Amino acid sequence: MVSKLTSLQQELLSALLSSGVTKEVLIQALEELLPSPNFGVKLETLPLSPGSGADLDTKPVFHTLTNGHAKGRLSGDEGSEDGDDYDTPPILKELQALNTEEAAEQRAEVDRMLSEDPWRAAKMIKGYMQQHNIPQREVVDVTGLNQSHLSQHLNKGTPMKTQKRAALYTWYVRKQREILRQFNQTVQSSGNMTDKSSQDQLLFLFPEFSQQNQGPGQSEDACSEPTNKKMRRNRFKWGPASQQILYQAYDRQKNPSKEEREALVEECNRAECLQRGVSPSKAHGLGSNLVTEVRVYNWFANRRKEEAFRQKLAMDAYSSNQTHNLNPLLTHGSPHHQPSSSPPNKLSGVRYSQPGNNEVTSSSTISHHGNSAMVTSQSVLQQVSPASLDPGHSLLSPDSKMISVSGGGLPPVSTLTNIHSLSHHNPQQSQNLIMTPLSGVMAIAQSLNTSQAQGVPVINSVASSLAALQPVQFSQQLHSPHQQPLMQQSPGSHMAQQPFMAAVTQLQNSHMYAHKQEPPQYSHTSRFPSAMVVTDTSSINTLTSMSSSKQCPLQAW
């Protein structure tokens, strides 16, 4: 006969036999070490003797699954064990210790559920818990299962060890019988149920009094299992049927009277009974899920608080939006505009902020090829009249932003001024800006005519007195916003190289300037800051030739 042992096993057997162990002792030791048909069961927990192996096979499989003290792992659905050793829960020990007929029926029901599909049983238990508003916490407290593992098993069908499933099924069978007994009690015993409920609450608060009403055997069980006393009561939970009724009533009346609340109590209890498949006359069997007038009152109070809180949030959001709408940004610029770090009262730019009926919008674009930057500024030319210069009007507002160009920051200027010539200069030259009053423009122009034209830009600063500014009475028939802008460039004209002079020429020939009478002269107005204009040296001659004209474009500034 060919031996099925490996060489290592043969060496071990030879070593045992050579050590003096006889064959009979070795066989007896093997019989003691080999697992019996009831794998995983401690023999002292069974009423039968270890020698009656044939009788052990006839016992229900439930006894072999409820002990769980064996170190070996079972096959099948036990592979998803969460890693912790799972002691036998008290509910299984209690059911195993009972020899009554009811306990035998419960064990048979648990065995039947263990033989079925675990996912089907999990869905059945989950539906029963939802029907009777049973929280998972109650199952965890009774069975000792892990909360996360139980939730995954009921919701997703996660595999669970057979011993744990036996504890879950035991709780399910006993809970079914408990709820059935509650609803099968007669209406006359409702008072006794109330007394018993009060007694249970008292025993929950003072568990030491429970031992006085117990017998010797029950006292020992209570001492051995103290965790049963610490189990919390089930918290009241509104069912879906009751919530639907209450929300419909809340739409009709947000603060019902006591009579209306009592009517809602009866309606909710009736719906809860129908949800559980029992007669509405057995509403007392709802137990902790029984709807009372106080619970209805609290529900309506909580809904009113929630509604008031939502309204407050909506009003806060609305007022915040209104605050932003009342303070819009009046300046329009490209994303390349960089704000100045100086305070608003030190900004050198000005803009017209007085609203007017007739407005002409124009724009100027500065293209810096060296820095690949595009700066676009927009301004509004409004009708300027002696009335608009009244000190009460906010004609000028120093809230403009600085425009960043290569070589340094420049203040915003009127849109009639085009400083495109800055793109032809070096960054070092753009810093050499000349500040001069209007009276010095003639001298600068005369000196530049005799010398070679240079590329140094000139800043013409109008004197602080408005005597240098001659306001123009704009015609009432101004351009509409949909008309073309003031500054237009023709590709074939030599003025295309100098957009500033082209804009000035168009302003002179434009029909928007009517022939006006001699404008009045104004006194010293030092409260208005100086207007800034940027031009180049090649445009000085034309600018000086226009200095005596009554229609100087500076009048629009």
Curated annotation (Swiss-Prot):
It is found in: Nucleus. The keyword rRNA-binding does not apply. Residues 66-85, 324-370 are annotated as: Disordered. One of its GO terms (cellular component) is transcription regulator complex. GO terms for biological process: anterior/posterior pattern specification; apoptotic process; branching morphogenesis of an epithelial tube; circadian regulation of gene expression; embryonic digestive tract morphogenesis; embryonic morphogenesis; endocrine pancreas development; endoderm development. Gene3D superfamilies: Homeodomain-like, lambda repressor-like DNA-binding domains. InterPro entries: HD, HNF-1, HNF-1_N, HNF-1_POU, HNF1_dimer_N_dom_sf, HNF1b_C, HNF_P1, Homeodomain-like_sf. Residues 231-311 bind DNA. Residues 1-31 are annotated as: Dimerization. Residues 1-32 form the HNF-p1 domain. Residues 93-188 form the POU-specific atypical domain. Keywords: Activator, DNA-binding, Homeobox, Nucleus, Phosphoprotein, Transcription, Transcription regulation. This is Hepatocyte nuclear factor 1-beta. It comes from Rattus norvegicus (Rat). The gene is Hnf1b.
